[in-house]
A protein has these predicted regions:
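Short structural boundary motif marking the start of a folded domain
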Residues: 1-4
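Short strand-turn-strand beta-turns centered on an Asx-Gly dipeptide
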Residues: 6-9, 53-54
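A short N-terminal beta-strand-loop micro-motif at the entrance of redox/enzyme domains
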Residues: 9-15
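Residue-level recognition of alpha-helix initiation/capping sites
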Residues: 14, 136, 146, 189, ...
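Iron-sulfur-associated redox domains of electron-transfer enzymes in respiratory
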Residues: 15-69, 75, 79, 205-578
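Fe-S ferredoxin-like electron-transfer domains
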Residues: 46-190, 196, 203-218, 222
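Structural motif corresponding to the C-terminal cap of alpha-helices
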Residues: 159, 198, 336-340
Length: 578
């Protein structure tokens, strides 16, 4: 152990501990901007500088190890002035039009500027007018970037993609897309993890709120909105409400108040996905020689983009089932439109998702009808819908609860857990077991696939089918390791669930941003608790899904089901795909 003194208080910590970590054990707060524990500890921003007795210069606390007898001052006049100077230098190269930024009120630089009383303009605003590319789901705004390198490190260390890189030298240093490409020319998965780890507004999702406001104002359009499972676990965070109070039903009221004609639950489509994907797995499993193995889930568009861009030879291994989002859109513009007696073209379908990659998915050429109309017209992230609610002065804290509309608003516990890593696998196995044996397993029989472990594997025995070898992975860095293991023959699975974001959709790139915090596990626990208390916990027991098959689709994997609910993953190309 190493003993040192910080601001007059003595503490003993393990050798190798940084000054910042040592201070945290004493609950002494040292401000940071670029720091992300175990990911970005490079001292680039120089905001965490501290004074150490015997050192001529101030040192960055985030990457300076403690030493025996060290005496540290975290807020001396010298330290405070240095932080103010460094903040001013950052502001000199930063677009300070905070009222126009989506991160206003939730910006680390803005917070630090206020904390250090840097009021007024200290530099002439003569930043170059650098055009912003708004053609992709992920948008980078050059003049808001503070060169903290977080996006570079998260993309490389967590997601294993290396899309972002440092370019230029000296005052020309900036962050850009590696290999001098545009983002659209790269193999970016649009997972959005760079956005949720950016401390400022340098990265954001493509804002589509204007399109939705226009649709809501158009009396000739019927607006239909679906709410993804993971959204209900996170939207309350913006309002500092208890998740038990900020229920999905209260969100329904908020959306109805905003003006949506129909508010449905993506859980319905998740149950439908299980019926199709589960049936597809059984078909493949019982006719092994006809298919490529293992079978991969296909509901995460970030993962699908990753596979097609990095391991294209495995594209045939993907389930042909569309994601719940896209199944919902297809059913809404066929079955539901028919049910209410309107032309499908009158429907404007909006998805509220925890995901930025969903914005790219809905625009794929394979996700349109024969006339070229998108099944889903617009995708909003959790952050965007809350901005809209705030813009309409809607306060969920005073709203009553309203149930989802029928018939696309019913979901089971199995559907809710789609938003947590392991949830799709768990739900699929529950119904696959029933479809094979005619008997329902215990709802928690497949709990081995749950939890935040980055790579989980299990073997389950299903009577009449034998052993089913499964794996669950989240985070693209972990996914790359799994794919290499499969490719080299080190592992052998039948069914694999992959989610691009660590922790699954609960930690998606469209979720609320809490700087320095990872809340996927917390949100996932909320979803598992909803499943635990649900009256129905099996997708095949969703009565509205049963009615959909009885009245319209006829059967899983049937002709109409295949036409509406399945897709050809070879029907579109990644930028580098031949």
């Amino acid at each position: 152990m190493v003993t040192l003194t910080i601001d007059g208080r003595t503490v003993s910590v393990p050798e190798g501990t940084t000054i910042l970590e040592a201070a945290q054990t004493l609950r002494i707060s040292i401000p940071t901007l670029c720091y992300l524990k175990d990911i970005n500890e490079i001292g680039a921003c120089r905001i965490c500088m501290v004074e150490v007795e015997g050192y001529a210069r101030l040192v960055p606390s985030c990457d300076s190890a403690v030493s025996e007898g060290m005496v540290v001052y975290t807020s001396s006049p010298r330290v405070r002035e240095a932080r103010r100077v460094n903040l001013r230098l950052l502001l000199s190269q930063h677009e300070t039009k905070c009222t126009k930024c989506t991160r206003s009120g939730n910006c680390k630089l803005q917070q630090l500027t206020n904390d250090y009383n840097l009021l007024g303009d200290h530099y002439i605003d003569d930043l170059k007018n650098i055009p912003t590319d708004y053609s992709n789901p992920v948008v980078r705004i050059e003049n808001r970037c503070v060169k903290c390198m977080r996006c570079i490190q998260v993309c490389e260390k967590i997601q294993g993609m290396g899309i972002w890189d440092l370019m230029g030298t000296g005052t020309r240093t900036t962050v850009g897309v590696a290999h001098t490409r545009t983002l659209g020319e790269s193999d970016c998965t649009f997972c959005g993890q760079c956005i949720t780890h950016c401390p400022v507004g340098g990265l954001q999702e493509h804002d589509d709120t204007g399109k939705v406001f226009d649709a809501l104002a158009n009396k000739d359009r019927i607006t239909v909105v679906q709410v993804a499972p993971a959204v209900r676990a996170a939207w309350a965070e913006f309002y500092h409400l208890d998740p038990k109070f900020a229920t999905a039903d209260r969100m329904v009221t908020a959306l109805k108040t905003m003006g949506f004609d129909y508010v449905f639950d993506t859980d319905f489509a998740a149950d439908l996905t299980i019926m199709e994907e589960g049936s597809e797995f059984i078909e493949r499993f019982t006719h092994r020689n006809k298919y490529h193995w293992p079978m991969f889930t296909s509901c995460c568009p970030g993962w699908v983009r990753f596979l097609k861009g990095q391991f294209p030879s495995y594209t045939e291994n993907l389930s042909t089932a569309k994601s719940p989002q896209q199944m919902f859109g297809a059913v809404a513009k066929s079955y539901f439109a028919q049910k209410i007696g309107v032309d499908p073209k009158k429907l404007f379908v909006v998805s509220i998702m925890p995901c930025t990659a969903k914005k790219a998915e809905c625009a794929l050429p394979t996700m349109k009808d024969e006339q070229g109309n998108q099944d889903v017209d617009v995708v909003l992230t959790t952050r965007e819908i809350v901005r809209m609610l705030r813009g309409e002065q809607i306060n969920p804290a005073v709203l009553p609860e309203t149930p989802f509309d029928s018939p696309l608003g019913t979901g089971t516990g199995a559907a809710v857990v789609f938003g947590a890593t392991g949830g799709v696998m768990d739900a699929a196995l529950r119904s696959a077991y029933y479809l094979i044996t005619g008997k329902e397993p215990k709802p928690d029989a497949f709990s081995a696939v749950r939890g935040m472990d980055s790579w989980k594997e299990a073997v389950f025995t299903i009577p009449g089918a034998g052993n089913v070898r499964v794996a669950v992975v989240s985070g693209l860095g972990n996914t790359r390791k799994l794919m290499h293991a499969i490719d080299e023959g080190d592992v052998d699975y039948d069914f694999v669930e992959v989610m691009a974001c660590p922790g699954g959709c609960a930690g998606g790139g469209g979720q609320p941003i809490h700087d320095g915090q990872e809340l996927a596990a917390y949100r996932g626990d909320i979803l598992w608790s909803i499943d635990k208390s649900a009256k129905v916990r099996f997708s095949h027991r969703n009565k509205d899904v049963q009615a959909l098959y009885r009245e319209f689709l006829k059967a899983p994997l049937g002709e109409k089901s295949h036409h509406l609910l399945h897709t050809d993953h070879n029907g579109w190309k990644m930028p580098n795909e031949k």
